[in-house]
C-alpha cells in the first residue's frame, strides 16, 4: 500500500492518520460522506419521505399518530403485517427500487380515472440514455407499447417531430415537471395519466444504469462480430472476464468476446469508446478529435461543459468553435453510474484514503455498493461513481410506466406489472390482474380470437395471463419450504410467503426475485446451510448459493459439482438436519447425505428413502427442519408428516392449509 508523500493541508494529514490507524489495527475502511451522494436518512426520515410521496402523509404534519395509520395502509398494500411499526421488513420494502407514481390516488397523476378517448396514440422519443445504443432503446419502447396493444384496441405510432400524445425522455434530478428524481436507485421513472399537455408523458431517471435487466448491454464495433453484443462473463486464455478488457492487446482498446468462450470460438469486437465513434450530435458518428477547442479552451477528453443535462460530449474536429461539429461520448465498459463523475469511466488503479485499489470496492460505504474513482486519486480529486451492476430493464420499467400513461394506477398484486416495486422477470408475461385492469378501460383487443362469452350470446374470449396464487383460495402444492435466517418461507412458482411463527398465517404473496434475484421462475428445493447461513436453491440440474440477497460468485453450478451423479437432473427436496448437521438431498425414491463441513457427499449414500425414513413417501415436495424443535416436517401434495428426530417416528399427519397457513 502506498500513500502520497506531499500533503498540503489538514484534510490530507487526517488521511495519513486514518491510514496509519487502520494499518495498525487492521480495521475496515472508515465510512465517509462522498461528494454528490445523497445523505443517508434515519428510518424515521425515510418513512416520512416515503409515506409523503407515495401515500399522501402530510410532510409537515406526519406526526406519530398519522404516521402509524399511514404505515398500516402501506403495509397492507405490500402484504406485510399491519402493525403500524417501522419494522425491518417495512424498511426493506421502502428501500427497494420503484416507480415514482404514488400508490394511492393522487390527482396530479390520476385525476378522475382518465383514459384516452381514441385508440390511435402517438409517441415521440425526445432523448436517449447513453447506457444503450439508440436501436436498443427504440426496440425496448416499441416492445413495451406492444405489451398493451396486444390486449386492447390501442395502437401506438411513433412520430419524430412535433407534439405526441406521449413524450418520452430521460432526465436527472429536477427535469422540468416538478417531480424530481433522486439519483441512483430509489425512484426509477414516472408517468402521467392520459390527457393534454404533460398527460401521458413518461420520464426515466438517467442516473440509473439502463440495461435489459441482466447487466450492461454492450454492442461491439468492428472486430469479426461487428454489431453483436458482449457476452459476460467470457473466457480468454483460461481466465474469466466480467467486463471489457484490454488483455492481449497493446493499443489500449477495450474488447470483449461475443460468445462465452473466446478461446473456443474466437468471436470478438471492440467496446464503445469515444476514440472509435460518437453517438448523436451532428458529427455523423465520427470519433472524438483530441484535443479539441471549445470556447477558447482546449479539451483532451470528453466534457460536460456547456451543457446542463450532464451528458459527456466532444468535438469531432479539432476546433468546435469554428466547425460546430460534435457528438456524445458512448458509455464505456466501465462507465460510472451516479456519483459526481458524470459517467466518466473508472480509472484503475486509484488511491483512496492512502490505499491502492485495482478494482471496484465498497470501502468507505456502509451500504455495500461498489464504486470506483474516475481519476487516479480519489484523495486528490474526489471524483467517483458507482460501478455498473445488473441495471434496470428499460423494457420492463417502460411497460410499467406506459401502463400509467394509459390510465392504470398501481396494483397491490405483487405479480402484476403494475406493482410499484421493480422486479426483473426474464420471461415476462402480462398478469391477469394487469389484463383485467386495462380491459376495464379499453375493452378487449380486436385481435383476440372470439369464443363463448359469459351470457347466452357470443362474446369475446378474455385474454388470460398468469394469476397470483392466494393461500386459502387455492390448494397450493409448494415447490419448497425452508427456514432462512429464523423465518419460514413457502415457495410456489415466482411467489413466496414468510412467517416467524410456524402456526401463524404467513405474509405475502411476495415475489421471490425481490429478495433473491437471478433465480429461475420456479425452484425445486431450498435449504439454509448452518455453517455460513447461506441459502441454497435448486432448479433443474443446477443450484444457486446466496449470502443474504447476493448471489455468490461462480453460481449457478451443476448438481454434479455437489457430488450427485449425472443421471440426477432435478431434486425434490433438501434440508439440513439439526441432529447431525448433515444436509439430506431427496430425488425420486433416493436420498444423499452431504457433509457441509467437508463440502463433499458421503460415500454411504445414495440410499432408498423407504429403507431409512419409515413412512416418508417418495417424490417429496419439500422438507423442513425447524431449529431446536426436535421435529422434521415432510411435505407432500396438500399434507405434511411430522417426524420426531429422536425416534425417527411419524407422530402426526396433517393438512398444510389449516396447520401452517392459518386457513
Swiss-Prot record:
Annotated tissue distribution: Produced by normal skin fibroblasts.
Domain Fibronectin type-II: 225-273, 283-331, 341-389
Positions that bind Ca(2+) 1: 131, 206, 208
Region of interest called Collagenase-like 2, as start-end residue ranges on this chain: 394-468
Pfam families membership: fn2, Hemopexin, Peptidase_M10, PG_binding_1
Ligand binding (Ca(2+) 4): 479, 524, 572, 621
Cofactor note (record): Binds 4 Ca(2+) ions per subunit.
GO cellular component terms attached to this protein's record: basement membrane; collagen-containing extracellular matrix; extracellular space; plasma membrane; sarcomere
Substrates-to-products reaction catalysed: Cleavage of gelatin type I and collagen types IV, V, VII, X. Cleaves the collagen-like sequence Pro-Gln-Gly-|-Ile-Ala-Gly-Gln
Stretches for region Collagenase-like 1: 107-218
Signal peptide extent: 1-26
SS bonds (residue pairs): 230-256, 244-271, 288-314, 302-329, 346-372, 360-387, 472-663
Binding-site residues for Ca(2+) 3, renumbered to this chain: 182-183, 205, 208
An example Gene Ontology biological process: negative regulation of cartilage condensation
Annotated keywords: Calcium, Collagen degradation, Disulfide bond, Extracellular matrix, Hydrolase, Metal-binding, Metalloprotease, Protease, Repeat, Secreted, Signal, Zinc, Zymogen
Enzyme Commission designation: 3.4.24.24
Subcellular location: Secreted, Extracellular space, Extracellular matrix
Active site location: 401
InterPro entries with a match to the protein in the record: FN_type2_dom (IPR000562), FN_type2_sf (IPR036943), Hemopexin-like_dom (IPR000585), Hemopexin-like_dom_sf (IPR036375), Hemopexin-like_repeat (IPR018487), Hemopexin_CS (IPR018486), Kringle-like (IPR013806), M10A_MMP (IPR033739)
Binding site for Ca(2+) 2: 165, 197, 199, 201
Start and end residues of each stretch annotated as Collagen-binding: 219-393
Chain spans, region Disordered: 445-464
Binding site for Zn(2+) 2: 175, 177, 190, 203
Subunit description: Ligand for integrin alpha-V/beta-3.
Family assignment from sequence similarity: Belongs to the peptidase M10A family.
UniProt name for this protein: 72 kDa type IV collagenase
Amino acid at each position: 500500500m502506498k500513500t502520497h508523500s506531499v500533503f498540503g493541508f489538514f484534510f490530507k494529514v487526517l488521511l495519513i492518520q486514518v491510514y496509519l490507524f487502520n494499518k495498525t489495527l487492521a480495521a475496515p475502511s472508515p465510512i465517509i460522506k462522498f461528494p454528490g451522494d445523497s445523505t443517508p436518512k434515519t428510518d424515521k426520515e425515510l418513512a416520512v419521505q416515503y409515506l409523503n410521496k407515495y401515500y399522501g402523509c402530510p410532510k409537515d404534519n406526519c406526526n406519530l399518530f398519522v404516521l402509524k395509520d399511514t404505515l398500516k395502509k402501506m403495509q397492507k398494500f405490500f402484504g406485510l403485517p399491519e402493525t403500524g411499526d417501522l419494522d425491518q421488513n417495512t424498511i426493506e420494502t421502502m428501500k427497494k427500487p420503484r416507480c415514482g407514481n404514488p400508490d394511492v390516488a393522487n390527482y396530479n397523476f390520476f385525476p378522475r380515472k382518465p383514459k384516452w378517448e381514441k385508440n390511435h396514440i402517438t409517441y415521440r422519443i425526445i432523448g436517449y440514455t447513453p447506457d444503450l445504443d439508440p436501436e436498443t432503446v427504440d426496440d425496448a419502447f416499441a416492445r413495451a407499447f406492444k405489451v398493451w396493444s396486444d390486449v386492447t384496441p390501442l395502437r401506438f405510432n411513433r412520430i419524430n417531430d412535433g407534439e405526441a400524445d406521449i413524450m418520452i425522455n430521460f432526465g436527472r434530478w429536477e427535469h422540468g415537471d416538478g417531480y424530481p428524481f433522486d439519483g441512483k436507485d430509489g425512484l426509477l421513472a414516472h408517468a402521467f395519466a392520459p390527457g393534454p399537455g404533460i398527460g401521458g408523458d413518461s420520464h426515466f431517471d438517467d442516473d440509473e444504469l439502463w440495461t435489459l435487466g441482466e447487466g450492461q448491454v454492450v454492442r461491439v464495433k468492428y472486430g469479426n462480430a461487428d454489431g453483436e453484443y458482449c457476452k459476460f462473463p467470457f473466457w480468454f486464455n483460461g481466465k474469466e472476464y466480467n467486463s471489457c478488457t484490454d488483455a492481449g492487446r497493446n493499443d489500449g482498446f477495450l474488447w470483449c468476446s461475443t460468445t462465452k468462450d473466446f478461446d473456443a470460438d474466437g468471436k470478438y469486437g471492440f467496446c464503445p469508446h469515444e476514440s472509435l465513434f460518437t453517438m448523436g450530435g451532428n458529427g455523423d458518428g465520427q470519433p472524438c478529435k483530441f484535443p479539441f477547442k471549445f470556447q477558447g479552451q482546449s479539451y483532451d477528453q470528453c466534457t460536460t461543459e456547456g451543457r446542463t443535462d450532464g451528458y459527456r460530449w466532444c468535438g469531432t474536429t479539432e476546433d468546435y468553435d469554428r466547425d460546430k461539429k460534435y457528438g456524445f461520448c458512448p458509455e464505456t465498459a466501465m462507465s460510472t453510474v451516479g456519483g459526481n463523475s458524470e459517467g466518466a469511466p473508472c480509472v484503475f488503479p486509484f488511491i483512496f484514503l492512502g490505499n491502492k485499489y485495482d478494482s471496484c470496492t465498497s470501502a468507505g460505504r456502509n451500504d455495500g455498493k461498489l464504486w470506483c474513482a474516475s481519476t487516479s486519486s480519489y484523495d486528490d480529486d474526489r471524483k467517483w461513481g458507482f460501478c455498473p451492476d445488473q441495471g434496470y430493464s428499460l423494457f420492463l420499467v417502460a411497460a410499467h410506466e406506459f401502463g400509467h400513461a394509459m390510465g392504470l394506477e398501481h396494483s397491490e398484486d405483487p405479480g402484476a406489472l403494475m406493482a410499484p416495486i421493480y422486479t426483473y422477470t426474464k420471461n415476462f408475461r402480462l398478469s391477469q390482474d394487469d389484463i383485467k385492469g386495462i380491459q376495464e378501460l379499453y375493452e378487449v383487443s380486436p385481435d383476440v380470437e372470439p369464443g363463448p362469452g359469459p351470457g347466452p350470446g357470443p362474446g369475446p374470449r378474455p385474454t388470460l395471463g398468469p394469476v397470483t396464487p392466494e393461500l386459502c383460495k387455492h390448494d397450493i402444492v409448494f415447490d419448497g419450504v425452508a427456514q432462512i435466517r429464523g423465518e419460514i418461507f413457502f415457495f410456489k412458482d415466482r411467489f413466496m410467503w414468510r412467517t416467524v411463527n410456524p402456526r401463524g398465517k404467513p405474509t405475502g404473496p411476495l415475489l421471490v426475485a425481490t429478495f433473491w434475484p437471478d433465480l429461475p421462475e420456479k425452484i425445486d428445493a431450498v435449504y439454509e446451510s448452518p455453517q455460513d447461513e447461506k441459502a441454497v436453491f435448486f432448479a433443474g440440474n443446477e443450484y444457486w448459493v446466496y449470502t443474504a440477497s447476493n448471489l455468490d460468485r461462480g453460481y449457478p453450478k451443476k448438481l454434479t459439482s455437489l457430488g450427485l451423479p449425472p443421471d440426477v437432473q432435478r431434486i425434490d427436496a433438501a434440508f439440513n438436519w439439526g441432529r447431525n448437521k448433515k444436509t439430506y438431498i431427496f430425488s425420486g425414491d433416493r436420498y444423499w447425505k452431504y457433509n457441509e463441513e467437508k463440502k463433499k457427499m458421503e460415500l454411504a449414500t445414495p440410499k432408498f428413502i423407504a429403507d431409512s425414513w419409515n413412512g416418508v413417501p417418495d417424490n417429496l415436495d419439500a422438507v423442513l427442519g425447524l431449529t431446536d424443535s426436535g421435529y422434521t416436517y415432510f411435505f407432500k401434495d396438500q399434507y405434511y408428516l411430522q417426524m420426531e428426530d429422536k425416534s425417527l417416528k411419524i407422530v402426526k399427519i396433517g393438512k398444510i392449509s389449516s396447520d401452517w397457513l392459518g386457513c
